[in-house]
Design a protein with these regions (language model features):
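Short helix-to-coil transition segments within interhelical loops
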Residues: 9, 281-290, 363, 372
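The feature marks short, hydrophobic/small-residue-biased sequence motifs that occur predominantly
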Residues: 73-85, 92-133, 161, 180-183
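Peri-transmembrane interface segments
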Residues: 44-47, 64, 171, 215-262, ...
């Protein structure tokens, strides 16, 4: 039977290759979209975990997505927080979107307090020396467009929110953001020079986090503020808690599965029509319906497995290329999603082959032999 299956596939090599390519594209589509979407979530969680704070304090009704909400509260609240027991550092921070040259989040920080949470690791240069200085991380520096005038080295000038800034230092990635401005400068650009978006707190002991929460909420004017530990915040940064995330993910996977289904259905159905006489010969020689179905499904399985392998391979190639060309783009491909992608492709292909296999098994041997 295996020789028969391979012979059928090799008899129409172009169609077989197209079917393999279609399944491969389905797998690439699933894995790449999942990698980009989930990569953004996991990267945001990892970056926040690297800031060094233990607690996040946000204004009432603020989104848990830190870059949404502007700078609605006075940065001087940090002075009030620093006076509370068990708080060693209170760092006011602003986060804002920059749409110049792509979507990125700009962080406005008070360098001394933010650095006290966990010190920056400078790979080149140093802290701000003026209001028009900017610090960037190493991945942002590496992702500079090619060509003169686009360099991102210490001393270079980059545009942020339509204004020129000099790069004073390049830091190791993993400290919340990729681009850091003085908090007063970013606030002024947003029209709120003395405000902040949120506050990162460092406690004297992790065991005192609940006490700190109670102290903050008991402070006049802060009773409605949101106080979360970093662990609590990170537990919210999952696909289940992001509006529309899982819906978009399922939609992409559904479209990819439909593509695989239609290609395998069309390919298998055409193959069955072309081999009507061969099917008639097999049935006249005593081949059962189950045997015919088995042959068709085995052909589909071989094509699908080859497509899955090709899809995973080219996704890895894409990951390497994107990692080199776009260092700031997280593109994790987990073993879990490799397996899921393979199962989705296999299910879609099998469903696409069921009707052609059933149709082939039902052919009357006499009619099939008379088919021209």
């Amino acid at each position: 039977m295996n020789k028969l299956v391979l012979g059928n596939l090799l008899h129409r090599p172009l169609r077989t290759l197209i079917s393999i390519a279609a399944v491969g594209i389905e797998v690439v589509m699933i894995l790449s979209i999942v990698a980009i979407m989930i990569g953004q979530v996991t990267n945001a969680s990892r970056q926040t975990g690297g800031i060094g704070g233990d607690i996040i304090v946000r204004p009432p009704n603020a989104s848990f997505i830190s870059s949404v909400g502007g700078a609605p509260v006075p940065a001087k609240i940090a002075e009030v927080l620093r006076k509370l027991p068990h708080i060693t550092v209170a760092a006011p921070t602003i986060t804002d979107f920059n749409m110049t040259g792509g979507v990125e989040t700009i962080w406005g920080i008070d360098f001394d307090s933010y650095n006290a949470l966990r010190p920056f690791v400078f790979l080149a240069g140093g802290p701000f020396t003026g209001p028009h200085d900017v610090m960037v991380d190493d991945l942002y520096a590496r992702s500079a467009p090619k060509g003169p005038g686009h360099e991102r080295a210490v001393g270079s000038t980059i545009q942020i929110l339509g204004h020129p800034f000099r790069i004073s230092g390049i830091v190791e990635h993993g400290k919340g953001g990729r681009v850091f401005l003085p908090i007063h400068t970013l606030g002024a650009l947003m029209g709120s020079p003395d405000n902040a978006s949120l506050f990162y707190i460092k406690s004297d002991d992790l065991k005192n986090q609940e006490l700190i929460r109670q102290e903050i909420l008991a402070t006049p004017g802060l009773s409605l503020y949101q106080v979360q530990t970093i662990q609590e915040w990170m537990s919210l940064m999952t696909p289940e808690h992001l509006p529309g995330f899982n819906i978009a993910l399922r939609a992409v996977i559904g479209i990819a599965m439909i593509v695989g289904f239609l290609v395998i259905f069309q390919s298998t159905y055409t193959a069955v029509l072309e081999r009507t006489r061969e099917i008639g010969i097999l049935k006249s020689m005593g081949a059962s319906k189950a045997y015919i179905v088995n042959v068709v499904l085995r052909e589909t399985a071989i094509v699908t497995i080859a497509g899955i392998v090709a899809g995973i391979f080219f996704t890895e190639v894409m990951r390497i290329i994107l990692g080199y060309r776009f260092p700031t783009l997280p593109f994790p491909i987990t073993a879990d999603w490799r397996i899921r992608g393979a199962v989705i492709a296999l299910v879609g292909s099998t469903l696409g082959a069921v009707y052609p296999a059933w149709k082939a098994a039902r052919k009357d041997p006499i009619d099939a032999l008379a088919y021209d």
